Design a protein with these regions (language model features):
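Glycine- and Gly-Pro-enriched alpha-helical subdomains that act as flexible
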Residues: 15-35
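Conserved acidic/glycine
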Residues: 5-8, 13-14, 18-22, 40-42, ...
Length: 174
């Protein structure tokens, strides 16, 4: 019984290459057997590996594999659908009898005019020109080359930074 041992949620972000590795099968099988309900794997399914499209070496039904392991399996059809992602996380937090796999369909290099959905977006820098074109695609300023908009920075500092500092202080006090 792991109820008392682990009283917090554990999240892991996994990609196509991770699902191709044997260790993911072994770990997932054990997690299902032990009914580790605090465990949530988010599978970024963009169908691309560093070598190329997953169809080169991977054709299994990941959802069926994890269902066979006893996992709760959910699908989010669009990685940019924040409402669907939030709903999937809520279902995970209410699941008390097994681990959860959330399969999220995405596009690697999303918004890059020449590299979206290619393995070059996985294992290579976009390059200055492709970065400029991608920023134009997003209607972002092209200069400076690295930019975090003030609103994003402020939101992160307020929601993540402040909360993280509070949680760290509470953890350190125990």
């Amino acid at each position: 019984d792991f109820e008392d041992l682990v009283d917090f949620d554990v999240y892991s972000l996994c990609g196509d290459g991770c699902m191709m590795e044997g260790i993911s099968s072994e770990a997932a099988s054990l997690a299902g057997h032990l009914r580790l309900s605090k465990l949530c794997w988010i599978y970024d399914s963009n169908r691309i590996t560093i070598e190329g499209h997953t169809s080169l070496a991977f054709s299994e039904d990941v959802a069926a594999r994890f269902e066979a392991y006893g996992w709760n399996v959910m699908h989010v059809a669009d990685a940019n659908d924040q409402a669907a992602l939030s709903q999937a996380f809520e279902v995970f937090r209410r699941t008390s009898d097994r681990p959860t796999l959330i399969i999220v369909s995405s596009h690697i290099g999303w918004g890059s005019p020449h590299k979206q959905d290619t393995n070059s977006a996985h294992g290579e820098p976009l390059g200055d020109e492709e970065v400029r074109l991608t920023k134009e695609n997003y209607s972002w300023p092209t200069e400076p080359s690295f930019l975090v908009p003030d609103g994003v920075y402020d939101c992160f500092a307020d929601r993540i930074g402040k909360r993280g500092a509070e949680l760290c202080a509470a953890w350190s006090a125990t």
